[in-house]
Design a protein with these regions (language model features):
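Alpha-helical, coiled-coil/dimerization segments enriched in small aliphatic residues
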Residues: 94-97, 212-240
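A ligand-binding cleft/hinge motif common to bilobed small-molecule-binding domains
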Residues: 133-142, 254-271
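Short helix-initiation/N-cap motifs at beta->coil->alpha
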Residues: 54-56, 107-116, 153, 235-244
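A short, structured surface patch at a secondary-structure boundary
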Residues: 67-121, 125-130, 231
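Proline-aspartate-enriched helix->loop->beta-strand connector
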Residues: 112-131, 145, 243-257
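Extracytoplasmic substrate-binding proteins
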Residues: 30, 58, 124, 135-208, ...
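Short secondary-structure boundary segments
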Residues: 72, 92, 130, 205, ...
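Bacterial Sec-exported substrate-binding components of ABC uptake systems
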Residues: 2-74, 173-202, 310-319
Length: 319
């Protein structure tokens, strides 16, 4: 397995594997279910900024952050997208988007960030992930660092988190612009597919063993918004293993694999039992770029539109 492949799996699946004893993009993983929110004081640049992160913890800064360390690729994407890129002082070895993020000093990888390196940058805000990084939060806070956990369980939750990070970083207008684009994409998709019958859909996160997106994940939520009925939801929370026998029995109408698991749709025909799936016989097997559905950041809007185009291609293409 290549280093790139290991990194992708760590960032996408490792959080959830520990949480449900099987697997982690968002840099995924399922959170506590607490929606990120902000208090009225968050809007005031003159006083303390207080928001509630995806773990349910209140996060307060006396003033907007100027030195931000990101512990997950999705968090780095958020910072750059909302106009806080100049405030970034370090990120992980997996940060590859946008291009300028590659030049950031590294504090380690997603699964094993180096606490000493993080502290050496004297951050006034650390953007962490949930699950595997839960214990890390305690260590960082014991050293006096302020930590915001990015771990949304829904598409709307991802939008709320982006807005919260914007408040903490003092770039609310940039965050609002990103949030508006994500909301517009959601409304466009819902207008096209919202009244259509749900198409049974399976989304493959990993092929060996077969893994999918279950309940309590923003991917599951996005499949529903895009007009799909996620058969992976029956397997439980997070990113569980999924039985091939159950897959064949449920026979999804649409089969979507992330690009890190399958390179081209035709690959599925080489798997025992898969050639007889309705999705395969009807030509409804697709490969989707993993970073636009696995990272809970601004590009989820692109991922949502792509999912709708795969689940309901004719309706999604209509003007």
């Amino acid at each position: 397995m290549t280093t790139t492949r290991i990194g992708r799996l760590a960032a996408l699946l490792l959080v959830a594997v520990l949480a449900v004893a099987v697997v982690a993009l968002s840099a995924c993983g399922s959170g506590s279910g607490t929606a990120a929110s902000s208090s009225p004081s968050a809007a005031s640049a003159a006083g303390p900024i207080t928001v509630t992160d995806d773990s349910g913890a209140q996060v307060t800064l006396d003033k907007p952050a100027t030195h931000i360390v990101s512990l997950a690729p999705a968090n780095t994407e958020i910072a750059y997208a909302i106009g806080a890129g100049s405030k970034m002082v370090a990120g992980t070895s997996y940060d590859d988007y946008p291009a300028e993020a590659k030049a950031l000093p590294k504090i380690g990888d997603f699964a094993n960030p180096n606490v000493e390196k993080i502290a050496s940058y004297s951050p006034d805000l650390v953007l962490a992930a949930g699950g595997i990084q839960d214990s890390l939060r305690t260590k960082l806070e014991s050293l006096g660092m302020t930590v915001y956990v990015v771990d949304p369980t829904t598409y709307d939750g991802a939008i709320a988190t982006i807005e919260n990070v914007g408040k903490l970083a003092g770039v609310e207008s940039g965050a609002t612009a990103v949030a508006d684009k994500m909301t517009a994409a959601q409304q466009e998709v819902q207008a096209k597919v919202g009244d259509l019958p749900k198409a049974t859909t399976f989304l493959e996160i990993y092929g060996k063993p077969l893994m999918t997106a279950g309940t309590g994940t923003f991917i599951n939520d996005m499949i529903g918004i895009a007009g799909g009925d996620n058969i992976g939801a029956q397997a439980g929370k997070g990113f569980p293993n999924f039985s091939t026998e159950v897959l064949v029995k449920d026979d999804p109408q649409v089969y979507i694999a992330d690009s890190g698991s399958m390179s081209k749709p035709g690959d599925i025909k080489t798997r025992a039992g898969f050639a007889d799936l309705t999705a395969v016989k009807d030509g409804h097997v697709y490969v989707i770029e993993d970073s636009i559905i696995a990272r809970p950041g601004p590009r989820l809007a692109e991922g949502l539109v792509a999912l709708a185009g795969m689940i309901h291609p004719e309706a999604a293409a209509a003007q």
